Amino acid sequence: MRATQSLPFKSFWSRSLDELSRLTNIVVKSENIRGATGPREIHNFQTPESVADCKLLSDADVGGSSTAHLDWVPPPNAIPTVTAGDGSDRKPYTPIPGSYARFHGTISLELPTDRREISRTGYAGFRTLDRPPTIFGRGLWDIDPYAYLAMRVKTDARSYFVNVRTESVVPLDLHQHRLFVKKPGQWETVLIKWNDFVRTNHGKVIEPQTGMLRQKVLSIGFSTTDRKAGPYELCVERLWATNDFDEAGVVETDVAGAQLKNKHGEKVKVTWGALEQE
């Protein structure tokens, strides 16, 4: 499955005003001294265009047969309505609480017959698109004031990774962590410590490890990890940065089972090829 076609983000000046408002709020509340006073939204799926702000990845990009889809699912009887424009070409919709994105498809281990250099398939994923620039420069997430990445998710019984891309000297580096849930098939709020992510490149853990560049986060995404043929489904309502440990209905407490390991720990499971290269 190729990348989702994206509509434009907010207009340049609208984005710049939003960023100016955020920076002003930090100064007024002295958050640069006292620390963040509340959570910071990273991405939510309350509008139809929210899924267009994401990119699909799978082994189909290298000739494999796995499929990947990202659908917007509103609550029953909800009708999207268009609000006033912000100067961009996209249609801005009124947010609908309770909406979510459904990432689903089928994993296939079949190798492409016309590309002998491809020796491994069986993966799929998606990530948020890189944020467009503002008058203040490149669009980046500064999550340094926060301890946790929080997410509202519902998974099947399969295994997934959470993947974080940052501005880096090595563009193909990813910071990864297992998405560990207690109740597959039910909605849960999961918290992962930013410091628990492990840096990888082309599916291998990088040694020595270096800390995530938390002031310059480019995108956040999810990927399958188990390489088992068959259907998969992961639903995501929203992602945000927080310092509030109590926000989680299920917190990532089983660190031994959830984290990647370095060369001094147990075996490491990672994603494959193309997901690192996009």
UniProtKB/Swiss-Prot annotation:
InterPro entries: Galactose-bd-like_sf, NADH-UbQ_OxRdtase-assoc_prot30, NDUFAF1. The keyword Transcription does not apply. GO terms for cellular component: mitochondrion; oxidoreductase complex. SUPFAM superfamilies: Galactose-binding domain-like (SSF49785). It holds the Pfam family CIA30. It is found in: Mitochondrion. Its main location: mitochondrion. One of its GO terms (biological process) is mitochondrial electron transport, NADH to ubiquinone. The keyword Mitochondrion applies. Residues 1-8 form a transit peptide. Chaperone protein involved in the assembly of the mitochondrial NADH:ubiquinone oxidoreductase complex (complex I). This is Complex I intermediate-associated protein 30, mitochondrial. It comes from Neurospora crassa (strain ATCC 24698 / 74-OR23-1A / CBS 708.71 / DSM 1257 / FGSC 987). The gene is cia30.
